[in-house]
Amino acid sequence: MTTDPTIFDESLGKELHQPLSVARMLFSGGMTVLAFLLTAAAVVPLFAILFEILRQGFPALMKLQEVRLFGVPVPLPEVLVSLPAPEGVQDRANGFANAIVGTLMMVGVACLFSVPFGVMTGIFLAEIGKNSAIANVIRFFTVILSSVPSIVVGVFAYGVIVLTKITIPIPLLNFKIQTGGFSALAGGFALGVIMLPIIALSTEEALKLVPTHHRLASAALGGGRFQTIFRIVVTSAIPGITTGVLLAVSRAAGETAPLIFTALSSQFWPQGLFTPTPSLSVLIYGYASSPFKNQNQLAWTASVVLIGLVVLSSILSRQVTRKRLKRR
């Protein structure tokens, strides 16, 4: 016994073209309005913060100063090429170029420490250990570390690096690593501890998103376990891993509390990895509460630059991901 399919087509068509009841239309409209209001509640504060920071800090970027680059005079914002002026001094160039350099130095040190260990930890959790007891323990402590307040990390780095005097010679490079005292090395270590769990967990999630048939295809072609992991799985997950690393960099660049305990600050150019080093976040913290207007203004402008660096890293991560996906 067969059923005429046109009967179902006609009934389905009538159901689809039947007008909605007033109650359903009101409910649908109400939920749409509610969704819009909730979205606005999340977005409006963000735009309000950005607007106020740009309004207060952007005008100072319009004040230019000529700097010679490779013998050619180039006009650049004064705040990006000058050192901070002394307190209360109004008639000289006022900037935070040293804080930008110090921030990049410490984030670079943090990346040297956290990226290799974080990526390898993520690979172990996703591909090697998986659900083993060791992997579960590592995953548990990694999640806990990601939720530890940054000021606690700063106190830890203060005790381990700042208060401990150790000299580690590196004969091949004719170089010595020295701990003890406030330094960019201590600040980079603290930021690296903050970045480590973010990179590890994001790497694990990125590797889990790689389809299983990629692994099976590699095994079918004779690929070994580690060949499959590093040449197939990790390569496919590079966009996600890169995004996680850049998100961790964004988080580290905005940290203040750990750097107060480790790198402290300075009014001068960074003198190396083993001396007190300025940073944008600490400069903002100190100058925002200053009684001098020129330092208050510098705090607003430094906030604009710091947000710009974070936004730039986010855009960079998206571009890297898109290019990688297009190649595939």
Briefly describe each language-model feature range.
Residues 204-208, 212-215, 219, 246, ...:
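C-terminal transmembrane helix and the adjacent membrane-cytosol boundary/short C-terminal tail
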